């Protein structure tokens, strides 16, 4: 019997038949189909969940690398700064290039800066 055939058989069962099936499976395998009880939130654990759900990122220029001019060009492109301001920003590395951007935009900026020879971190 294939998985598809099993799924089809389950789809054709009534609610009562499904409840009996669940009971028999629980007995046969010694398990419980009951949902696990939610535990009280531990303050330390909450921080880990917030990190996973982070929606805004800072693009941090850690090191310029050997191609400073290329890095300045990319910084100008992604920030809209003029040449003088972009050069000053690159000269101040390590520093944030852009703050509070979406994950997609942050990844794109990181990729461009790394292609230009810089070392970049997302924070």
From Swiss-Prot:
Q: Name one GO cellular component term.
A: cytosolic large ribosomal subunit
State the source organism's domain of life.
Answer: Bacteria
Q: Name one GO biological process term.
A: translation
Q: Which family does it belong to?
A: Belongs to the bacterial ribosomal protein bL12 family.
Q: What biological function has been recorded for the protein in this entry? A: Forms part of the ribosomal stalk which helps the ribosome interact with GTP-bound translation factors. Is thus essential for accurate translation.
NCBIfam families tied to this protein: L12
Matching PANTHER family: 39S RIBOSOMAL PROTEIN L12 (PTHR45987), LARGE RIBOSOMAL SUBUNIT PROTEIN BL12M (PTHR45987:SF4)
Q: What is the name of the protein in this document?
A: Large ribosomal subunit protein bL12
Organism source for this protein? Halothermothrix orenii (strain H 168 / OCM 544 / DSM 9562)
């Amino acid at each position: 019997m294939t998985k598809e055939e099993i799924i089809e058989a389950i789809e054709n069962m009534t609610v009562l038949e499904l409840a009996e099936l669940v009971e028999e499976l629980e007995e046969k395998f010694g398990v419980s189909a009951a949902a696990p009880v939610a535990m009280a939130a531990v303050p330390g654990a909450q921080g880990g969940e917030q990190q996973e759900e982070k929606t805004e990122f800072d693009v941090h220029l850690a090191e310029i690398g050997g191609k400073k001019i290329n890095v300045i060009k990319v910084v100008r492109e992604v920030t809209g700064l003029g040449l003088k301001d972009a050069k000053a920003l690159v000269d101040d590395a390590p520093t944030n290039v852009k703050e509070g951007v979406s994950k997609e935009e942050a990844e794109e900026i990181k990729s461009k800066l790394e292609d230009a020879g810089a070392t970049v971190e997302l924070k």
